[in-house]
UniProtKB/Swiss-Prot annotation:
Protein name (database record): Maturase K
Protein's organism: Ranunculus acris (Meadow buttercup)
Main location: plastid
InterPro entries named in the record: Domain_X, Maturase_MatK, Maturase_MatK_N
Name of the coding gene: matK
Subcellular location: Plastid, Chloroplast
Keyword RNA-binding on entry: yes
Length: 507
C-alpha cells in the first residue's frame, strides 16, 4: 500500500491557478487561430472547418469588451427557448472562446509534461504520432499472441464528473465554471461518442479543439490504471503517456475498490499480472491482446468493467468488451481488417548426404482493405452507388478540367498512401478504378460527351495524373525494388507521416 501511495501521490506544485484572466488576452486567440490553421485535416479546406474569415484583431477586441461588460454570459430574450451568447453573434463568439479555452486549458498539462522529462534524455522522433507506426508493432507482437479484447471506451454518467476530475489539474474556480457553462449551453456531452460526433459533425468541427481536449482527457482518465499495471508487467511500458495520466483519484477510492473485489489489492494485481498483455488505442476503441487463456481474458474483461464503474464512475457494460481469438477473427482497427493467419512455407534441410523437406507454418499479420465499407463511404460521398458502379459528381462540373482531375487524383493518391500496407492490393485497385471512372464521367458530363469518346480523346495522360506521382515517390524511397512493378505491388509499405485518417477512410 505504501508503494501505491507514493505512486499515485500528485505533486501539488504542478497545479496552476488563475487561468481565467488569460481569456481576456488578445494573443491567446491569435495563437489558437494560428494553431488551427497549421493543424487542418489533410484535403479539407478552411471553409469546411469554419476557419475562413473568422479571425481579426477587431473581432477579438470587440469580444473582450463584451466579456468585460457582460455580467452574465447567458441572456434570455422573450423566447425562453432561445439564448443569446454575448450578443447576437453567438456562433462566432462561442467558437472563438471555445478555441481560446482549449488553448489555455492545455497549459497545466504542457507544463507537467516538460517538468516530468527534466533531467532525462528524450529520444527525438518525428514518427511517434504516425498512425502507420502502430502496424509494425502489431506485426512484431500479435503473431505471438492468442486472444484479443475489443473494447469500446466507456463514457461518464454525467459531465460533472469530468469537471471534478479537472479540478485535480486546474484550481481556478472561474475557469471551471466556464467549462460547466459550455457543457450546459450546448448539451453536447452525448456527442463524445463517435456516432453522435458524426451525426453532429458541423457543430463538432466548429468547436473541434475544445471537445477533442475534453474527450482525450476523459480517455486518459479511463486509461490511468494501465500506468500502474505496466509497472507490474514486463511489456506495458509507455513512457510517452506518463505525464497525462491522473493519479490522485485512484488512490482516493482504493478502499471502495477493496470492498468490490473482497480481496487484498496486491493479490488482485497479482491475479491479473500478465507479461504478455499489450494495449493500444485509437479514437473511441481500444485493443488489449494476450497470450493467456480464455479464462484470463474473462478476468480482464470483468476487472475493467468493475474498475471503470466503481472507481471512475464511467458507464460501461460487459457487452462493450468482446473476446476473440486472433486466429479466427478479423480486427477492424484504423481502417484495416487485421488478422493473424499461419503462413505455410517449405524448407529444404540438407544433412550430409540426406535432404529433408520440412513444411512449417509461421504466423503472419494480414492487413486487408475493407472493400465493402469503403465502397459504402464512396457511395455516401456520391462517387459511386452502393454496388460500386461509378457515377459523376455534378457539383464539381463548374470547375476547370485540371482542377477536377487534380481533386480526383488527390483522393486516389490519399487512398493509395494510407492502404499501401495492405497484404492484398486488388481491393485497392478497385477503389482507384471507381475514382478514375467517376472522374471520367464527371468530365464527360461537363463537356456533354460520352465516357468512351472522352477517354479516347484524353488518352494516357488521364491515367498519369493518378499514377505517376505515386510511382515517383515509391521509386525514390525504394530504388532497389522500383524496377519491378510486379514486386512493388506486393510490398507492404508503412508511412510514418500519417497523423490523421481522411473522412472517407474513417470507418
Amino acid at each position: 500500500m505504501e508503494e501505491l501511495q507514493r505512486y499515485f501521490k500528485m505533486d501539488r506544485s504542478q497545479k496552476r491557478d488563475f487561468l481565467y484572466p488569460l481569456l481576456f488576452q488578445e494573443y491567446i486567440y491569435a495563437l489558437a487561430h494560428d494553431f488551427g490553421l497549421t493543424k487542418l485535416i489533410p484535403y479539407e479546406s478552411m471553409q469546411i472547418l469554419s476557419y475562413e474569415n473568422k479571425y481579426s484583431s477587431l473581432i477579438v477586441k470587440r469580444l473582450i469588451i463584451r466579456m468585460y461588460q457582460q455580467k452574465h454570459l447567458i441572456i434570455f430574450d422573450n423566447d425562453s427557448k432561445k439564448k443569446k451568447f454575448l450578443g447576437h453573434n453567438k456562433n462566432l463568439y462561442s467558437q472563438m472562446i471555445s478555441e481560446g479555452f482549449a488553448x489555455i486549458v492545455k497549459i497545466p498539462f504542457a507544463l507537467r509534461l516538460v517538468s516530468s522529462y527534466q533531467g532525462k534524455e528524450i529520444e527525438k522522433s518525428i514518427n511517434l504520432g504516425s498512425i502507420h507506426s502502430t502496424f509494425p508493432f502489431l506485426e512484431d507482437k500479435f503473431v505471438h499472441l492468442n486472444h484479443v479484447l475489443d473494447v469500446l471506451i466507456p463514457y461518464p454518467i454525467h459531465f460533472e464528473l469530468l469537471v471534478q476530475n479537472l479540478r485535480c489539474w486546474i484550481q481556478d474556480a472561474s475557469f471551471l465554471h466556464l467549462l460547466r457553462f459550455f457543457l450546459y449551453e450546448y448539451h453536447n456531452w452525448n456527442s463524445f461518442t463517435t456516432q453522435k460526433m458524426k451525426q453532429n459533425s458541423l457543430f463538432f468541427k466548429e468547436n473541434r479543439r475544445f471537445f477533442l481536449f475534453l474527450y482525450n482527457f476523459h480517455v486518459y482518465e479511463s486509461e490511468s490504471i494501465f500506468l500502474f499495471l505496466r509497472k507490474k508487467s514486463y511489456h506495458l511500458r509507455s513512457i510517452s503517456s506518463i505525464a497525462f495520466l491522473d493519479r490522485t483519484h485512484f488512490f482516493g477510492k482504493i478502499e471502495h475498490l477493496k470492498v468490490v473485489f473482497r480481496n487484498d489489492f496486491h493479490t488482485m494485481l497479482w491475479l491479473f499480472k500478465d507479461p504478455f498483455m499489450h494495449y493500444f488505442r485509437y479514437q473511441g476503441k481500444s485493443i488489449m491482446s494476450s497470450k493467456g487463456t480464455p479464462l484470463l481474458m474473462k478476468k480482464w474483461k470483468y476487472y475493467l468493467v468493475n474498475l471503470w464503474e466503481c472507481h471512475f464512475y464511467f458507464w460501461s457494460q460487459p457487452n462493450r468488451i468482446h473476446i476473440n481469438q486472433l486466429s479466427n477473427h478479423f480486427l477492424n482497427f484504423l481502417g484495416y481488417l487485421s488478422s493473424v493467419r499461419p503462413n505455410p512455407s517449405v524448407v529444404r534441410n540438407q544433412m550430409l548426404e540426406n535432404a529433408f523437406i520440412i513444411d512449417i507454418a509461421i504466423n503472419k499479420l494480414n492487413t486487408l482493405v475493407p472493400i465493402i465499407p469503403l465502397i459504402g463511404s464512396l457511395a455516401k460521398a456520391k462517387f459511386c452507388n452502393l454496388s460500386g458502379q461509378s457515377i459523376s459528381k455534378p457539383a464539381w462540373t463548374d470547375s476547370l478540367d485540371s482542377d477536377i482531375i487534380e481533386r480526383f487524383g488527390r483522393i486516389c493518391r490519399n487512398f493509395s498512401h494510407y492502404y499501401s500496407g495492405s497484404s492484398k492490393k486488388k481491393p485497392l485497385y478497385r477503389i482507384k478504378y471507381i475514382l478514375r471512372l467517376s472522374c471520367a464521367r464527371t468530365l464527360a458530363r461537363k463537356h456533354k460527351s460520352t465516357v468512351r469518346s472522352f477517354l479516347k480523346r484524353l488518352g494516357s495522360e488521364f491515367l498519369e495524373e493518378f499514377l505517376i506521382e505515386e510511382e515517383l515517390v515509391l521509386s525514390f524511397i525504394l530504388p532497389k525494388i522500383s524496377s519491378s512493378s510486379h514486386r512493388l505491388s506486393k510490398e507492404r509499405i508503412w508511412y510514418f507521416d500519417i497523423i490523421r485518417i481522411n473522412d472517407l477512410m474513417n470507418l
